[in-house]
Curated annotation (Swiss-Prot):
Residues reported to bind NAD(+): F29, F30, D51, S93, Q111, K112, N140, Q179, P180, Y181
Name the record gives this protein: D-apiose dehydrogenase
Source taxon at top rank: Bacteria
Gene (name only): apsD
Function: Involved in catabolism of D-apiose. Catalyzes oxidation of D-apiose to D-apionolactone.
Length: 375
């Protein structure tokens, strides 16, 4: 071996893979899943935390061994050398925080719902595009192993061309004890949960041209709607039904499982309880289990959701590394957020809503950039 060859071998074996450094903003209920997931992902490290609540901030830092703690996001962005921020706060703070990150030239992940209005969401997308930094919405439900398995089967043509589908989430699980603010929200199930299920419908069947929706409130102790049924017409020709309920008291609680039915020109697909995936076509019927993998930190009944957090955050790091656009980029998520707005409009006015009617650019709402955040 020549000296040149030896040098090339040494260089190849000592090459290190870039480790992306991030900070998490918002140390509340769901952020622990983010932090656990970051630990499981090669090439990523959370080096700082930020939260307006000093006690919660300190507890998260101690639990995950993170020493650099901030109560002000602007101060953190100024002091730290970051590749990205993971914004795990509630929606009212999203625009100011995303704009802060864009001004600092830092890529951003933003929890869902992306924004309270389409105008704010468009402003965030524009800010990041002007700054040339990636923006991804943490729309994790489509990244559940079972939903990914359904998507692969449809792409592989297992049942031919789909023409009808249903995506269903029905439960009576107490989501309010961990997130009490949900009981006070005037817009509840569509904005908090339905946004996930609508995004799954987009993931499986493509973009939507029009929808009609009905909502109701069964639980008188909460402010918002807890039942929604939405009929969607997709550009692909598929007609789908999205139905969501937190008022369905079943013999067996399936939270947080999402069930899927799809009829195609050559067969049917069913994702039923316990992640049982059944595909029937001309070759017969086959079944498989699409259960989430065991994670050391996972907790019952959240395993599938927690697995989806790992998957979407791993996808984010891959996009940062190769320069690709995230599946649920800010610009892509405008389409999911538009479905939420169209659902509320349809339910309120009792009519079918054409999605094109929401595509016109709305004037951006003025927002101040406050660094104090809370989840």
């Amino acid at each position: 071996m020549s000296a040149t060859d030896a040098t090339q071998v040494i260089s190849a074996t000592t090459t290190t893979v870039k480790r992306f450094k991030g900070a998490l903003i918002g140390c509340g209920f769901f952020s622990r899943n983010h932090l656990h997931a970051w630990r499981d992902i090669d090439g990523a490290e959370i080096v700082a935390l930020c939260d307006a609540d000093s006690e919660r901030l300190r507890a998260a830092g101690q639990a995950f061994g993170i020493e650099r703690l901030y109560r002000d996001a602007a101060a953190m962005l100024s002091a730290e050398q970051l590749d990205f921020v993971d914004i795990a706060t509630t929606a009212p703070s999203h625009r100011s925080l995303v704009e802060l990150a864009a001004q600092a030239g830092v890529a951003a992940i933003c929890q869902k719902p992306f924004a309270l209005t389409l105008a704010d969401a468009r402003a965030m997308v524009a800010a990041c595009e002007r700054a040339g930094v990636p923006l991804m919405v943490h729309e994790n439900f489509r990244w559940q192993p079972a939903i990914q398995a359904v998507g692969r089967a449809l792409r592989d043509g297992a049942i031919g061309t789909p023409f009808w589908g249903r995506v269903s989430f029905r439960s009576a699980f107490d989501v309010f004890s961990g997130q009490p603010y949900l009981a006070r929200n005037e817009r509840f199930i569509v904005e908090d949960l339905g946004i996930h299920i609508l995004d799954i419908a987009r993931f499986l069947f493509g973009d939507v041209t029009r929808l009609a929706a009905a909502t109701s409130r069964v639980n008188s102790a909460i402010a918002g709607e807890d039942v929604a049924t939405i009929l969607l017409t997709h550009e692909s020709g598929v007609t789908s039904v999205v139905d969501c309920s937190y008022a369905s008291r079943q013999a067996r609680e399936l939270f947080p499982q999402t069930l899927v039915e799809v009829d195609g020109a050559e067969g049917t697909l069913r994702l039923s309880a316990d992640y049982r995936l059944e595909i029937h076509n001309r070759d017969g019927t086959r079944t498989a289990t699409a259960a989430p993998p065991p994670l050391a930190w996972a907790s019952v009944p959240w395993e599938a959701i927690q697995a989806s957090v790992v998957n979407i955050q791993r996808h984010w790091i891959a996009c940062l590394r190769n320069g690709g656009e995230p599946q649920t980029s800010g610009r892509d998520n405008l389409k999911t957020l538009a479905l939420v707005e169209a659902t509320y409009l349809s339910a309120r006015e009792g009519r079918t809503v054409e999605l094109k009617s929401l595509e016109a650019e709305a004037p951006a709402v003025t927002s101040t950039s406050s660094g104090a955040v809370r989840r």
